[in-house]
Amino acid sequence: MRNGVTLVEDPERLDSLDQCKIILVSGSTGSGKSLLLETLEKAGEQVIHLERLAKHKGSTLGNYPGEPQPSQKMFESLLWHQIQFQLDPSQVIWVENESAKVGKVAVPNRLWKKMCQSPRIHMVVQLEDRVKFTMSDYSYFCDKENAANSAGSLEDLLGRLEKHAGKQKSKDWIQLAKEGDFEKLTKELIVGYYDLNYKKPRGDPLATYEVNCD
C-alpha cells in the first residue's frame, strides 16, 4: 500500500520495464507537458500518457468531465499491457514527470522508482502563455456562455483548496468562478496555488526549453 492506495503489481509483467529507456518531461502547471507528449506521439515517438490512462490530470481540478477514474487494478493492467505489448524497450519512451499519485490511483512502485532514476527535460513557459495553455486544457470550466453551469462543480472543487490556500483566497476564487472571469481565476490559481505547491524535480535536467504559444 502507498498513499492509501493498494497496489496490485504482477512481477512477471515487469521484466521489460527494467530495459525501458525513459525520458521525463517536467515543467510547472500550464507549461504544455501533455501537449508535448501528444505531439511526440503523433510524430511516432513512444509515450506513456499516465494522465490519459488514469483519466485524471493529476491536480485538485483534474477530474475528466463525465469520466470516472479506473480502479487501481485496471489502471495497472492498462499500464503493464502497454509496456509489455505496445512499446519497444530498446527505444526511448517519453513520460510526464507526474507525482506518485494521479488522482486516486498510484503509479506502481517499480515504474515510480524507474521514473525517479530517469533523465528529464524541463519546459519553461511565460506566465501569460501558461494561462492560455491551462484555459485550453480546462476549457470545460472556462466557458463564459455557460458560466453558471461550468462554475457549479468548479465552486465545489475550489472550496477544497481552502485548507491549502486559506479561506479568503478560496472565497475570492469561487467569486471569480461565479463571475465567469476565468482568465483572472486561472492566473491566480497558477500563482497563488500551483506554483506554491510545485515540487521541484530532483537533479538537473538534460536540457531546458523555453516554449511560447506563437
Q: For each predicted feature, which ranges?
A:
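Conserved NTP phosphate-binding and transfer environment spanning the P-loop NTPase/kinase superfamily
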Residues: 113-214
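Thiolate-centered catalytic microenvironments shared by cysteine-dependent enzyme domains
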Residues: 1-9
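Conserved nucleotide-sensing/catalytic segment adjacent to the nucleotide-binding pocket
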Residues: 42-114
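Gly/Ser/Thr-rich loops at beta-strand to alpha-helix junctions
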Residues: 1, 29-31, 100-102
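Hydrophobic/aromatic beta-strand patches that form the interior of the parallel beta-sheet core
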Residues: 23-25, 46-48, 93-95, 119-123, ...
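Glycine-rich phosphate-binding P-loop
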Residues: 21-42
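Phosphate-binding P-loop
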Residues: 13-20
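Structural motif
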Residues: 27, 97-99, 213
